[in-house]
Amino acid sequence: MYIYSQKKKLVACIYKFRKKINSRINLSPENELLQASIIKFDKNFNLNRHIHTKVSRKTIGTQEIWIVMGGKLKATFYETDKTKICSKILKKGDISILFRGGHKFETLEKNTIIYEIKNGPYIKDKDLKKF
């Protein structure tokens, strides 16, 4: 599920967990700076050794991925002008990718655990603005 701003800019992507995956699901459009996929491997699959070559990229802002490992939370997404777009409930196994705009989350169950992955370097005093 893609979440767009009023100006048709991609703000976030949410993937709701499901057990049946045939092979690969690319969660991010190819043109986004943060790429994420879900990949199913069969037994004895071998990913050939490889190196990712140096490629210069320009990043503006921080992109984040949340993977809900347990519990439940409510994620709210905002336009860059701080206008609320929508809220979604995320449960165990769900993934949220934030490309731009604002966000917040509120835990709905005790012991909610997420993995948070973001591009860096993270500059604590300059990287976010609370509203």
Please give the residue ranges for each predicted region:
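Short acidic-glycine-tyrosine-enriched beta hairpin
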Residues: 79-100
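Conserved hydrophobic/aromatic beta-strand scaffold that supports enzyme active sites
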Residues: 38-40, 49, 65, 87, ...
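Short beta-strand His + acidic residue motifs that chelate non-heme Fe in jelly-roll/DSBH
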Residues: 49, 75-76, 96-98, 103-109, ...
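Glycine- and acidic-residue-biased ligand/ion/polar-headgroup-sensing regions
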Residues: 42-43, 61-78
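Short, surface-exposed beta-strand-loop junctions and turns on beta-sheet-rich folds
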Residues: 55-56, 81-83, 120-122
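Double-stranded beta-helix
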Residues: 2-6, 106-131
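Conserved short histidine dyad/triad with adjacent acidic residue
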Residues: 38-60
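A short, N-terminal "cap"/entry segment at the start of jelly-roll beta-barrel domains
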Residues: 1-40, 88
